[in-house]
Amino acid sequence: MQDEFKTDTPRTEAGSEKETMPSMEELLKAAELAAAEHHDAWLRAKAETENMRRRAAEDVDKARKFAVESFAGELLAVKDSLEAALAAESPSVDNLKDGVTLTLKQLSAVFGKFNLHDIEPLGEKFDPHLHQAIQVVESEQPANTVVTVLQKGYRLHDRTLRPALVMVAKGKD
């Protein structure tokens, strides 16, 4: 019967398993350390995201504020020309007209450089995206054809900045 109660070998095996298996306190400490590392990484990622959002907002504000900076710089030469014309002691009408013509060419060149183009609708079919009809008139032209331009329109790239004010032909009755 004493042989049945000998359990030295299993106790030794269980004892050796106890030595290799970490205790609950060690597992808890390891889990707490991992959780602290993950929390710290999350806080850093959150701070980085907030910094990126703030920098992006600042970049948008700067872009909005200085979007016309180069356009404005180009217009300074036009302003200088107009001021020089006004400063002339006794400009003749021809000289003044030549100066205004050159200034208009300068201004048109600046507009072209920045993709600001005239809308020239005379003789074209009325387009409500590009034209604003002020009046419908009797004309020999086909119906809905622009017959008179009262004020030029302008496009910036593909967007209408200001529609052309036009008179449109009425359909023949």
UniProtKB/Swiss-Prot annotation:
Q: Where is the composition biased (Basic and acidic residues)?
A: 1-20
- GTP-binding as a keyword of this entry, yes or no, is no
Q: Where is this region: Disordered?
A: 1-23
What's an example GO cellular component term for this entry? cytosol
Subcellular location per UniProt equals: Cytoplasm
The protein's superkingdom reads Bacteria
Query: Keywords for this entry?
Result: Chaperone, Cytoplasm, Stress response
Q: How does it assemble?
A: Homodimer.
Q: What does this protein do?
A: Participates actively in the response to hyperosmotic and heat shock by preventing the aggregation of stress-denatured proteins, in association with DnaK and GrpE. It is the nucleotide exchange factor for DnaK and may function as a thermosensor. Unfolded proteins bind initially to DnaJ; upon interaction with the DnaJ-bound protein, DnaK hydrolyzes its bound ATP, resulting in the formation of a stable complex. GrpE releases ADP from DnaK; ATP binding to DnaK triggers the release of the substrate protein, thus completing the reaction cycle.
Q: Which family does it belong to?
A: Belongs to the GrpE family.
Q: Per its record, how is this protein called by name?
A: Protein GrpE
Species name:
Thiobacillus denitrificans (strain ATCC 25259 / T1)
Q: What is the lineage of its organism?
A: Bacteria, Pseudomonadati, Pseudomonadota, Betaproteobacteria, Nitrosomonadales
Gene assigned in the entry: grpE
